[in-house]
């Protein structure tokens, strides 16, 4: 076992340590809680941080390991859960003061699976109001920040999960993604974030494009978590049929790259222009795959400004109706940027809404058609560096809030698995001398979640040494 601090160890290393009795789940929980105490004043990543409850779970796990009777694949491994994933008895505020704090009746499917597997739920993690922003800006939580540079956003809407993973709040973190909300924080925080195929991980409530998935520091831990999350749950009416997938192949077996057909997508076709440093990093990743025998072919963009606008307008109308259902005082407590964005749908006709919804189908068709010539598509996750921590989006414009998701959202609507894995670093625009991670997106054919993980694992092995994880401000 390495001399790495316990809070820095991956889930596989922790489980090996428990089996060897080198350390216990209680030792690890205490180390993770100490790390959270060091970092949390700087990044505000957690909600419902209850140390005594976490320690009680760890003691119970410790007793199971002492008897040689671990209860599941994650027994004793610390995990955080995004606050919109219900945990029994806890409120689900959705990042906003507008939601009444009523206790959830039951665990949502992802929370139920990790609890059954013995994971120690250390905390819930933060999100912006209704998960509608690519930042940690919230009327309910303190604003979450990026550990690599606390003047920048960690991304969103899985803001706290991304920040927590980068800061070392244990190895496993659960996020959700409907347009990039796992992959954007993963990219901007330098971690791994998988948006599975639609329905691969049962959720409640299900919705078009919405997925829950792992956010971890490496691919092996993401695959281990998928082994648990992908188990069936009848509450998800959009779930895929149960399938026997050997997720361990993502870390046990190298994926041959010779002849693999990779599309290189460097322009989204809509939204913001890719920053030069990000383009260079993604092109370098393509060269690494090509050197191993993969066939890399530049591909034209398949999204258009009209498709992105259609998605945007449909979500505006959905949000307007959600806000209209609130009492006036609750509605007034929602972030002004979200209220302005949603209110802009007020003048839409029924025909406008239908055309906006039709853009979702057109996006699905375009995405699936573009994927047909390739086994995988690689691209930037985001065209831009993380914005200032208090901006709602990279444009800081309520009516242009989705212009950075042109690379991510097609794979929500098209239902393909897509992962972010770190592929380099760029200078922070906010702090001289600070570096910010760059995310490579790898998308695969529908249902090929294992293949996407294997490609990301192959890239981890090709990319070379990474920078050290960020240090607590003032402690470097």
Indicate residue ranges for each PLM-predicted region.
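An N-terminal boundary/leader segment
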Residues: 1-56, 291-293, 468-476
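Short helix-loop capping/hinge segments that flank enzyme active sites or metal/cofactor-binding pockets
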Residues: 74-94, 253-266, 314-368, 420-437
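A short helix-breaking turn/cap at a secondary-structure junction
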Residues: 195-284, 303, 462-476
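Short glycine/serine-rich loop segments
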Residues: 106-233, 412-425, 429-441
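Acyltransferase
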Residues: 22-30, 59, 247-251, 274-300, ...
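Residue-level signal for inorganic ion chemistry
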Residues: 32, 54, 222, 262, ...
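Serine-dependent amide/ester hydrolase catalytic core
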Residues: 13-19, 63, 256, 266, ...
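Acidic/His- and Gly-rich active-site-bordering loop/insert found
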Residues: 54, 64-139
């Amino acid at each position: 076992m390495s001399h790495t601090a316990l809070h820095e160890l991956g889930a596989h290393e922790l489980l090996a340590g428990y089996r060897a009795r080198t350390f216990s789940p209680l030792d690890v929980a205490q180390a993770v809680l100490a790390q959270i105490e060091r970092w949390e004043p700087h990044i505000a990543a957690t909600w419902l941080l209850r140390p005594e409850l976490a320690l009680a779970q760890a003691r119970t796990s410790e007793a199971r390991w002492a008897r040689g009777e671990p209860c599941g694949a994650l027994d004793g491994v610390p995990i955080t859960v995004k606050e919109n994933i219900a945990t029994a008895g806890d409120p689900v505020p959705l990042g906003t003061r507008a939601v009444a704090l009523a206790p959830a009746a039951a665990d949502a499917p992802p929370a139920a699976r990790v609890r059954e597997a013995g994971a120690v739920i250390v905390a819930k993690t933060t999100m912006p109001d209704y998960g509608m922003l690519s930042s940690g800006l919230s009327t309910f939580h303190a604003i979450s920040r990026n550990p690599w540079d606390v003047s920048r956003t960690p991304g969103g809407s899985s803001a706290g999960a991304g920040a927590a993973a980068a800061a070392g709040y244990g190895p496993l973190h659960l996020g959700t993604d409907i347009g990039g909300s796992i992959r954007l924080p993963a990219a901007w925080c330098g971690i791994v974030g998988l948006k599975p195929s639609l329905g691969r991980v049962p959720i409640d409530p299900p919705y078009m494009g919405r997925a829950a998935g792992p956010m971890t520091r490496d691919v092996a831990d993401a695959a281990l978590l998928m082994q648990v999350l992908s188990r069936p749950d009848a509450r998800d009416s959009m779930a895929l049929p149960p399938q026997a997938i050997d997720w361990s192949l993502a870390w046990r077996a190298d994926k041959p790259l010779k002849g693999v057909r990779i599309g290189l997508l460097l322009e989204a076709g809509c939204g913001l222009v890719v920053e030069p440093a990000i383009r260079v990093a993604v092109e370098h990743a393509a060269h690494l795959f090509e050197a191993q025998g993969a066939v890399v072919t530049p591909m034209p963009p398949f999204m258009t400004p009209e498709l992105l606008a259609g998605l945007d307008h449909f979500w505006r109308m959905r949000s307007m109706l959600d806000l209209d259902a609130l009492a006036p005082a609750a509605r007034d407590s929602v972030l002004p940027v979200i209220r302005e964005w949603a209110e802009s749908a007020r003048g839409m006709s029924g025909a406008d809404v239908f055309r906006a919804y039709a853009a979702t189908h057109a996006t699905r068709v375009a995405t699936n058609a573009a994927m047909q010539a390739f086994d995988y598509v690689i691209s930037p996750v985001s065209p831009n560096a993380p914005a200032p921590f208090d901006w709602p989006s990279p444009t800081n414009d309520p009516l242009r809030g989705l212009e950075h998701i042109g690379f991510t959202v097609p794979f929500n609507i098209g239902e393909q698995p897509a992962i972010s894995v770190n592929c380099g670093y760029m200078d922070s625009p906010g702090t001289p001398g600070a570096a910010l991670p760059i995310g490579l997106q790898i998308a695969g054919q529908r249902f090929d979640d294992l293949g996407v993980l294997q490609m990301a694992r192959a890239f981890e092995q090709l990319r070379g040494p990474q920078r050290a994880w960020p240090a607590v401000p003032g402690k470097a």
